[in-house]
Swiss-Prot record:
Entry's Gene Ontology molecular function annotations: orotidine-5'-phosphate decarboxylase activity
Gene name of the encoded protein: pyrF
Record's protein name: Orotidine 5'-phosphate decarboxylase
Keywords of this entry: Decarboxylase, Lyase, Pyrimidine biosynthesis
Species this chain originates from: Halorubrum lacusprofundi (strain ATCC 49239 / DSM 5036 / JCM 8891 / ACAM 34)
UniProt pathway: Pyrimidine metabolism; UMP biosynthesis via de novo pathway; UMP from orotate: step 2/2
Amino acid sequence: MSFFETLADRIEATDSVVSVGLDPDPNRLPEFLANADLPRWAFNRRIIDATHEHAACYKPNAAFYEDADGWRALEETIAYAHGKDVPVLLDAKRADIGNTTRQYAAALDRADAITVNPYLGRDSLQPFLDREEKGVFVLCRTSNPGGSDLQDLELASGEPLYERVAALADVWNGNDNVGLVVGATAPEELAEVREIVPEIPFLVPGVGAQGGDAEAAVEHGLADRPDAAVDVGLVNSSRGIIFAGEESSRPDDEATYFGAAGDAAKRLKKRLNQYR
C-alpha cells in the first residue's frame, strides 16, 4: 500500500487531517521528565498517547534528534506511532548528490514519508522518488518569513520559482508518491499552487504558532484524488499542540500537561473540519 493510500485510510478513520509535529525542544521539556532515560522519547510517547485519536500523521523534525540519544528516541517514537496505526512523516528536508542521497533515503526504512529539498534537482531526489511505497514531500512555498527571498523570484518565463517547483514535482510524480510543502502563511500562493497540481497532496505547516490561514490550508491543501474516499493532505501544528501544557492550569502536573496537548489537537481537528 502506498503512503497516500495509507494516509487516506487514516484520515477517513479519524475524520482528521491534523499532522502533529513532534519537535521535542530540550529547552522546553517539562521538568518532571528531566530524569527520564530518554527525555525526548518519554515526552513523545506521552504526546502520542494524548493525541493519537486526533492525528492523521506524526511529523518529527530530524533537527531535534541529531545526536546519539536523539536517534534512539526517534526510532522509539516512530515504532510507537506505528503501534497506534499512525503514519510518520520525517521532516528532514534532505537532498544531496549520488551516494550521499542514497544514504539519506535509507532513513525511510522506518518512516513512511519524508520532506526533501529540490534545490539540487531531480537526481538528488531520485532515490526517494524510487521508493514507490513512501511519500516524498518537496519543499515548494514554505511558511517562514524568508521563504520569499528565493521562492518568489521571477524566472525568465515570468513564473515565480515556487510555481516551477510545483510543475516539476508533477513531472517527477511517476510513482504517484509526491507531495508538496506549501505554508498556510502564504494563502494566495497556496491557491495558485493548487491550480497547477490539482491531485498532489500538500503538507501545510504554519497554522499553529505561526498563525497561518486555516481555511485556506484546508480549501487548497487537500487534494481531490480519484482513488480516495476523502480529500488527502495534512495540516501541521507542532508547538501549538505539543507545548500547549505550558499554558495549562497545572503545567507541573503530568496528566494536566499532556491532557492540554490532547485538547489542542482536538480543537485543531474541529477547527479544520469546519472547512472540509
